[in-house]
Amino acid sequence: MRRIAFLLALAGLALGPAGCGDRNMVLTVNLLSFIAPADRSGGYGPIPAGLVGTSVDLIDQDVTLLPGLSSVVDVESATLRIGMRFENQTGSASGHVLVYLAPSDSTSAFGVPPLADIPVTLAPNDTVQVATEIASSPALSAALTQEHARLGVRVSFDTTGSLSVLQGSETTEELLGIVVTKRSL
């Protein structure tokens, strides 16, 4: 019995400092919560077969992120989780889901380079789930620690291999920013 108590105490001492987090703070920003439920889904098409680079803007909206954060903390890492569902009805296409976070004074979210470029392939009468996590980068860290930003999601379709018109619907299911910070000294 004493041996078990000793092992439990030893495990507690070993794991205690690990839970402290070295004064890190993890902040989660549900970007999807800024988008009205009716605006999280939309249709695309009809897009004729044989076209390259047909873009459909799904989201272009102002969001409030983490007010005052950048002046009191240093960002250790930032990630962005993205989840979408495409319910394609007709036609086929390859494409790219592009995610943008522009400064809030921008007239459009699409005036800056995308933070994410996710490939997607659509076939007739098929449902495709797209899910990815964008790793930390200076651009992502800067974007997620602004007070306000303009969020954009665009899909670019290439229907050159399709024999029929591309048409279907898209639902954005997850846009989650995770920022790990450390207090500035």
Question: Which positions does each model-derived feature cover?
Answer:
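A short beta-strand element within beta-rich, extracytoplasmic domains
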Residues: 73-91
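Short, low-complexity, Pro/Ser/Thr/Gly-rich segments in the mature regions of secreted, periplasmic
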Residues: 172-185
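Short, surface-exposed beta-strand/strand-loop-strand elements in extracellular ectodomains
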Residues: 90-111
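Cysteine-clustered segments with highest specificity for TGF-beta superfamily mature ligands
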Residues: 120-170
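Post-signal peptide N-terminal segment of mature Sec-exported envelope proteins
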Residues: 28-51
